[in-house]
Amino acid sequence: MLWRRAALAGTRLVWSRSGSAGWLDRAAGAAATAASGMESNTSSSLENLETAPVNQIQETISDNCVVIFSKTSCSYCTMAKKLFRDMNVNYKVVELDLLEYGNQFQDALYKMTGGRTVPRIFVNGTFIGGATDTHRLHKEGKLLPLVHQCYLKKSKRKEFQ
């Protein structure tokens, strides 16, 4: 398990245009540093290995207005993705069961949200719940305003760049 964490720490989750996920080396320098023994503290190295999935999740959430952490065989996940498709809202999906390190991501999501079930849905950087919670927000008329709020923020950021 430790070798998996070490491999995870040196990589970054990326998505292709087709929507598939894969791992990309974060930096060759990280591997060189570890190989040369320049790690100053074993406990801080282990701490970094523990936080790598959390950091990658947070980066994904901050880069996208809607993120659905899902599993391909989950009917609730399918229901949540359909809701956003029907609303004509772009979303980023991370299929945990297709990732080599999906269990570590699910553990990190548990630490962040208090639950291991999927889907885990984030809108505008905030965890809103699972499929049932998302449908409830939609029926109450609160979901679309959250999504629009995010798109407005992102468009304003682009104006000032």
From Swiss-Prot:
Q: Which InterPro entries match?
A: Glutaredoxin (IPR002109), Glutaredoxin_euk/vir (IPR011899), Glutaredoxin_subgr (IPR014025), Thioredoxin-like_sf (IPR036249)
| Entry's Gene Ontology cellular component terms | mitochondrion; nucleoplasm
Activity regulation: the record says: The 2Fe-2S present in the homodimer leads to inactivation of the enzyme. The 2Fe-2S may serve as a redox sensor: the presence of one-electron oxidants or reductants leading to the loss of the 2Fe-2S cluster, subsequent monomerization and activation of the enzyme.
Indicate which residues the UniProt annotation says bind [2Fe-2S] cluster. 65, 150
Cellular localisation: Mitochondrion
* Keyword Iron-sulfur set for record: yes
Keywords for this protein: 2Fe-2S, Disulfide bond, Electron transport, Glutathionylation, Iron, Iron-sulfur, Metal-binding, Mitochondrion, Phosphoprotein, Redox-active center, Transit peptide, Transport
Q: Name one GO molecular function term.
A: metal ion binding
- Limits of the Glutaredoxin domain: 54-154
The domain of life is: Eukaryota
Spell out the disulfide connections.
74-77
Where S-glutathionyl cysteine occurs along the chain? 74
Which positions does UniProt annotate for glutathione binding? 71, 106, 118
Phosphoserine PTM positions:
20
Outline where the chain's transit peptide begins and ends. Answer: 1-19
Give the multimer and partner information: Monomer; active form. Homodimer; inactive form. The homodimer is probably linked by 1 2Fe-2S cluster.
Q: What does this protein do?
A: Glutathione-dependent oxidoreductase that facilitates the maintenance of mitochondrial redox homeostasis upon induction of apoptosis by oxidative stress. Involved in response to hydrogen peroxide and regulation of apoptosis caused by oxidative stress. Acts as a very efficient catalyst of monothiol reactions because of its high affinity for protein glutathione-mixed disulfides. Can receive electrons not only from glutathione (GSH), but also from thioredoxin reductase supporting both monothiol and dithiol reactions.
Q: Family assignment? A: Belongs to the glutaredoxin family.
Question: Can you say what this protein is called?
Answer: Glutaredoxin-2, mitochondrial
